[in-house]
From Swiss-Prot:
Highest taxon in the source lineage: Eukaryota
Cellular component, GO annotation: membrane; mitochondrion; pollen tube
Protein name according to UniProt: Probable aquaporin TIP5-1
Described function: Potential aquaporin, which may facilitate the transport of water and small neutral solutes across cell membranes.
Domain notes: Aquaporins contain two tandem repeats each containing three membrane-spanning domains and a pore-forming loop with the signature motif Asn-Pro-Ala (NPA).
Length: 256
């Protein structure tokens, strides 16, 4: 029995560092970098266009459109490689649902975090006249309320991801990412003025790291992670129960 333990551990470790797994991590890095660059950059762009006053409707509309388009594209370009997570909340939900292993999820998170920080650093270095914006909670909201709101938004987003990636629905490859982007854009429109409509811990982490302030950072982790995990459990166990032989089909569906 003692000989089987290191062998099993070694095989799992080799799987996490296999060439296919490394391709997934690189894919997540590229897609997350692109998304964060567009999502955070759109806020800086709207600030520039409106001379610093982003309190009007266009202050939310521009980032919402950018989030929708960038997320659709980011998910699409990595869909067949890594599953197009682009979001630690999605990765966490996939791990909770048993579609990826916990070690793989940790490497996904690492790729996503590094990509987010790098994207925000690029914005900081290239746009010298502005600081990198961070997600903030509106004055009329509490931290708990913002966490609940972010959790609900993440639930809707992750539920859409599970629906779009379900091979039993037979959706064309290009359709799923479009719907995922639509939901993200709608969520930003709905919650942008209140919590920022992040839904993505990596995006919030990268901007906070570069800006140098982690105030209320827990809001953008606890809410999305719990919301995403709940969506995974509800989809797989209540709405569309997964069959016993789901292992091979769902594995192919998310690209890992």
């Amino acid at each position: 029995m003692r000989r089987m333990i290191p062998t099993s551990f070694s095989s799992k470790f080799q799987g996490v560092l296999s060439m296919n797994a490394l391709r997934c991590y690189v894919s997540e890095f590229i897609s997350t970098f692109f998304f964060v660059l567009a999502a955070v950059g759109s806020v800086m762009s709207s600030r520039k266009l409106m001379a610093g006053d982003v309190s009007g409707p266009f202050g939310v509309l521009i980032p919402a459109i950018a989030n929708a388009l960038a997320l659709s594209s980011s998910v699409y370009i990595s869909w067949n490689v890594s599953g197009g997570h682009v979001n630690p909340a999605v990765t966490f939900a996939m791990a909770v649902a048993g579609r990826i292993s916990v070690p793989t999820a940790m490497f996904y998170w690492t790729s996503q975090m590094i990509a987010s920080v790098m994207a925000c650093l690029v914005l900081k270095v290239t746009v010298m006249e502005q600081h990198v914006p961070i997600y903030k909670i509106a004055g009329e909201m509490t931290g708990f309320g913002a966490s609940v709101l972010e959790g609900v938004l993440a639930f809707v987003l992750v539920y859409t991801v599970f629906t779009a990636s379900d091979p039993r629905r037979g959706l064309p490859l290009a359709v799923g990412p479009i719907f995922i982007g639509f939901v993200a854009g709608a969520n930003v429109l709905a919650a942008g003025p209140f919590s920022g409509g992040s839904m993505n811990p990596a995006c919030a982490f990268g901007s906070a790291m570069v800006y140098g302030s982690f105030k209320n950072q827990a809001v953008y982790w606890v809410g999305p992670l719990l919301g995403g995990a709940t969506a995974a459990l509800v989809y797989d166990n209540v709405v569309v129960p997964v069959e016993d032989d789901r292992g091979s089909s769902t594995g192919d569906a998310i690209g890992v």
